[in-house]
Amino acid sequence: GSEMCIRDRTNEDHVTYFMSNANALTYLTDVIDNINYWSNYILTEWTGSYKDSFKSNSTSESNAQGSSISNLVNGLCYHYESIIRKGKIGLPLGAFNGFSQQIEPDLVECYYHQESLPFVIESVNAMKKYINGISFNSSENGLGLDNYMTHVGAMQNSNSLSSVINSQIDEIIEKVGQLNDPLS
């Protein structure tokens, strides 16, 4: 099945592959159905009563464990630590593989495509956009976690925490951009 992902294929080659391989088509359809289900579920929850529940559990005095803000920040940290840092970089490089520290290049994202770094950079950029309240289809800085940090006066040393985080993310993107693909 890996022949489908090789980067020299055209769009038509990909369509032909899925249309002529029942298992691949089933997998693709299942992925699309899953994305559609969860997108609609989240939209329904946020346009329903969950938005009010989230807000009522998110006052500046209520950032303790179990609060909406705490859960949001912990989820963001998990995403960065486990999905991006560990999953996309650390495991393939052997940094998180127990005592062996064995390099496992086959664990990189898009192994057969031979380009995984653009996906690492895009993941980090998406995280930055999320923090700064930037929609996936806009470059406008809307209300985000950065505004909450400013509202509660979150600081590291004498710098605003949101500025420190954004600077660190920019540095991560710069450093990842200095790596060479393929990581595999």
Residues of each region from the PLM?
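Short, small-residue-biased leader/transition segments that mark boundaries at the very start
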Residues: G1-I6
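A surface/extracellular/periplasmic glyco- and lipid-processing/surface-interacting theme
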Residues: T10-K86, G90
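An amphipathic alpha-helical core segment
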Residues: F18-L28, N40, E45, K51-S53, ...
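Flexible, glycine-rich surface segments
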Residues: F54-S158
